[in-house]
Amino acid sequence: VLSLHKAFLSVCEAPRTHLAIQIVKKPCGRAKWDADEVRDDLQQYVVEFLAEQDGVLIIDETGFLKKGTKSAGVGRRYSGTAGRIENCQIGVVLAYRFSKGHALIDRELYLPQAWCEDRTRGCEARIPDTNSFATKPALARELLQRTVAAGIPARWVAADEVSGGDSKFRNLLKNRD
């Protein structure tokens, strides 16, 4: 759902990385792969090579600005990325911060209820029939539960106002102790 090229551009700042982006972009654009399997592999890598007891889990939402109406979950809503109401998709993301760096280790696309109820539109956007409406805090809880189940240790959890203000999210954290 998210453009690999845009993802690479956001983390690759030096001009010399353009060639690396093109090398990776071509085969990835044609390849069929399961994003959840890639996430699981990444989380396993974090557990084996990067995890620290003092790690920090960071949960936030981010906006992906869009021009059209066909992308999954797109609509006019507030985007922190733009700082105003824009046509965009919203993703809930979980990053892991450790002493040597950080990694984005999980994500879910927020699908507004109208998108979940309109199966024709959902089918056109290739949204699986198994998807159902979930609030952004519910998605954050899902990300946190998957991360804990993967065995990624963390001493701290930081969350944006939406997730951090959710009593079910805070109770999930309290019950982990």
PLM regions and their residue ranges:
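Conserved, well-structured functional cores that handle cations and Mg-NTP chemistry
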Residues: 1-157, 162-177
